[in-house]
Structures are given as C-alpha cells and as structure tokens.
C-alpha cells in the first residue's frame, strides 16, 4: 500500500509529465509543420526543436527514476535497472543543458552588438557555428553518459561484492546510502554549461545597457524594436537561470537525501521540484516566442469557433 505522500507524489509527477510532454511536444510539432511548409528551418527553430526533444527525454527518464526510487526502492537498488535509468538521465541531462546553453549563446550573438572581431565573425557564421555546437553537444553528452555508465557499473559491482561477503563496514555503507549514486553527483557538474549561459546573460544585459544609453541620446518616446528584442531574450534567459537554480538545488537534495531521516520524502520533493525546470522553461518559451504564442492563440480561437458552430 502506498502512503498518502506517495499518492500525492504520483499525482503531481504524473501531472508534470503530461504538461511537460504536451508543452515540449507542441513546440516540436509547430516547428516541424513550419519546416514542412517552408522546406527549410530557421536556426532558432532548429535549436528549439533539438532542445524540446532532449527535454521530452529528460522529463520521461526523471519521472521513471522518481517513481522507481520513491515507490519501489528495493527494486531500484537491487537490480541493474539503476544503471540504465541513470545513464539515460545523464545523457538527457547533459544534452539538455548544453543545447539550452547553445540557445542562450545564440540569443547573445544574434541580438547583442559588439565591435570585437571574434564576435563579428561568430555573428556572421552563426548558422554554421550553431550546427557544430549542437553536434558537439551530442558528442559531449554521449561521452559523459558512457563514462558515467562505467562508473556506476563499477559501483554496482563493488556493493554487490561487499554485500556478498557480509562485511559489516561495507554493509553499513550499502544500507545507509540507497539513493546515493555516483551518477547523481556526476550530474551536478552540468553547472559548467550553466556558467556559459550565465556569462552570455550578463553580456546581453551589458549590451542592452549600452544600447539604452545610445537610445537616450537621440531619443523619442517608447521602446525601439531592438530594445524589445533585448528585453524578451533577457526574460527568457532569466527564467532559465531561476528554474535551473531550483533544478540544481533539488538535485543536491536528492543526491544527499540518504543523510536525512525522511530520505524518501526528500527524494519525492526533489524530483517534483526538479521537473519544473524542463517543464517551466519550455512553457515560458511558448509565451515569449511570437510564432509559438500566436499559433497557440489561433488554435484556441479555432476551437472556440468550432464549439460555437
């Protein structure tokens, strides 16, 4: 029998899963239809499509991981299912983080203004740069997940041997750390692409500040289009920073939940909060992206008309 906390956890995480799949699936579908109609895809749509696919994978593996850990902990710790789930989690996590970083760097290169030769070259070759970056994102994520799988396999064999030998000391560690995997701690190093995103964010804010100063010299009332684009990009990047901070903190909570008396509750809470990152940021992208937002509004309008008819 599940406890009330388990029931609440399953309901919440199922709701997050549905919203996450619908939100990210909507972005992928809109971009795919637009690609079919125009026979080409813009760089921003290409990045977003890759991003939401990685987030669908991330949300799916996080939901499976959360349910198995919280509801069936014995199955998780006593089988090789742990290796498979955590390897896919690492791959999806790193891929998602690096593609999001690619998106933030794209915003900076596309919107910001600078006279630096390197910046001008990257801005001119942005389409080629983005495609190479995305290829690099996939390669890095695959390499990291393979290394993580090896580390986790070694850890699994070590604890199996310790348990088999009935060594008191090792058995103590095995029994006291059911939710602590090297892979979870390994995923915390995804802060590296986050730092790159943070640098892009501050450079974009600096560009907006300089642009605003120039506007004031000639200025007239209202915002110019460039300022609006700056502000929209900064809103998107700010939401990413905030949601990733929650994701990072919740990952730390899950990682060290074995130290807490109510570790199962800590794991459930951490998983629920962590999924808000790939779910919430994609919903914010829909709201702040003109094409995605207008398409959604047209869908609602058509549905209302159909209901009236």
Swiss-Prot record:
Annotated compartments: Membrane
Cystines in this chain: none
Membrane topology: Multi-pass membrane protein
Cytoplasmic topological intervals: 29-50, 104-131, 206-239, 288-309
Protein's job: Receptor that may play a role in the perception of bitterness and is gustducin-linked. May play a role in sensing the chemical composition of the gastrointestinal content. The activity of this receptor may stimulate alpha gustducin, mediate PLC-beta-2 activation and lead to the gating of TRPM5.
Family in the record: Belongs to the G-protein coupled receptor T2R family.
Protein name: Taste receptor type 2 member 8
Organism whose genome encodes this protein: Gorilla gorilla gorilla
């Amino acid at each position: 029998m599940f406890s009330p906390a388990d029931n609440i956890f399953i309901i919440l995480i199922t709701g997050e899963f549905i919203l996450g799949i619908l939100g990210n699936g909507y972005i992928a579908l809109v971009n795919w239809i637009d690609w079919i109609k125009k026979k080409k895809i813009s760089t921003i749509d290409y990045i977003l499509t890759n991003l939401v696919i990685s987030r669908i994978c991330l949300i799916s593996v996080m939901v499976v991981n959360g349910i198995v850990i919280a509801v069936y902990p014995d199955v998780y710790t006593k089988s090789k299912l742990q290796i498979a789930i955590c390897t896919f989690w690492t791959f999806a996590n790193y891929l998602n983080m690096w593609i999001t970083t690619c998106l933030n760097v794209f915003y900076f290169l596309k919107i910001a203004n600078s006279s630096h030769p390197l910046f001008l070259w990257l801005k001119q070759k942005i389409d080629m740069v983005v495609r190479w970056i995305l290829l690099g994102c996939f390669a890095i994520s695959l390499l990291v997940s393979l290394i993580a799988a090896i580390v986790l396999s070694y850890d699994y064999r070590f604890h199996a041997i310790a348990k088999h030998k009935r060594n008191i000391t090792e058995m103590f560690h095995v029994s006291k750390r059911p939710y602590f995997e090297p892979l979870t701690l390994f995923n915390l190093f995804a802060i590296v692409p986050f730092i790159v995103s943070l640098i892009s964010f501050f450079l974009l804010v600096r560009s907006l500040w300089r642009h605003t100063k120039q506007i004031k010299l000639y200025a007239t009332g209202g915002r110019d289009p460039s300022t609006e684009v700056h502000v929209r990009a900064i809103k998107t990047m700010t939401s990413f920073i905030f949601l990733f901070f929650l994701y990072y903190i919740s990952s730390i909570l899950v990682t060290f939940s074995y130290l807490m008396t109510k570790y199962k509750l800590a794991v459930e809470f951490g998983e629920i909060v962590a999924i808000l990152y790939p779910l919430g940021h994609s919903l914010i992208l829909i709201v702040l992206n003109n094409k995605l937002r207008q398409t959604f509004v047209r869908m609602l309008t058509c549905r209302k008309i159909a209901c009236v008819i």
